[in-house]
């Protein structure tokens, strides 16, 4: 009998501190940097974002989202046999955020736990990885988390990037099933574009070598993102032999409303079939897709049997898509 993986529970967590464009603009004005709500909304669709407090870590956010996903799944947390955290902003160089989540969940079953880094494509990469683990037969209940504290790597002297990103976490529980849940996944990367979206620094000899802040060539990212997202979405659909007209919900990486609308248009999907949270969350990198997925599940938009297409693109350059039957 063929073994599949299905999402049986979703969860998410946003730090309580919500910062509107007006509040951020006022903060930047004190530094002599000019921006406005209109400027930010016009270019990105973002109206607010959430920031973690200084003593809150990536694994803290991840664990809270994980608890909610496990509760929604209706399983005992001791049944989790794989934890995978997609993040670019872990607590430490090591140990992994996944091991810290395991500790914070109180899991003593010695389940496998590791991090995966594909920036804003991270959750799709993580979902595809966990799907393969389950299909191979060695694992039954996988916890896949996207979690970020991007506010820690923003240069608040650069108005073109600091207004775009926020913090948060989203999680799903994948379970082995006889019924198809994840219908297809497609992953790609092109390292020749590594320099258009990056944090070009590292720790060497106890000091930071290079820059510890995010750098982005916005125009280059926009041009590449719209093109590769359309291609990888069609690839995932073709692998599952599903037409774009059969998609009930499109959940793209929540980076920029113009990129998202461009992708939906290329697939021939009306805007009302796209889940949008970028206005309230900003770009939360690997957390953006599971945050949006959880929102649409909990408010009842996503129903059992719906076809849901997830797609992400991020630094590396990486991109990927996953087609689900919920």
From Swiss-Prot:
Gene3D superfamilies named in the record: 3.40.47.10
CDD domains listed in its UniProt record: KAS_III (cd00830)
GO MF, any single term: 3-oxoacyl-[acyl-carrier-protein] synthase activity
Catalytic activity: malonyl-[ACP] + acetyl-CoA + H(+) = 3-oxobutanoyl-[ACP] + CO2 + CoA
Pathway(s) the chain acts in: Lipid metabolism; fatty acid biosynthesis
Database matches in PANTHER family: 3-OXOACYL-[ACYL-CARRIER-PROTEIN] SYNTHASE (PTHR43091), BETA-KETOACYL-[ACYL-CARRIER-PROTEIN] SYNTHASE III, CHLOROPLASTIC (PTHR43091:SF1)
Entry remark concerning the domains of this protein: The last Arg residue of the ACP-binding site is essential for the weak association between ACP/AcpP and FabH.
Name used for this protein in its record: Beta-ketoacyl-[acyl-carrier-protein] synthase III
The species this protein was found in: Ralstonia nicotianae (strain ATCC BAA-1114 / GMI1000)
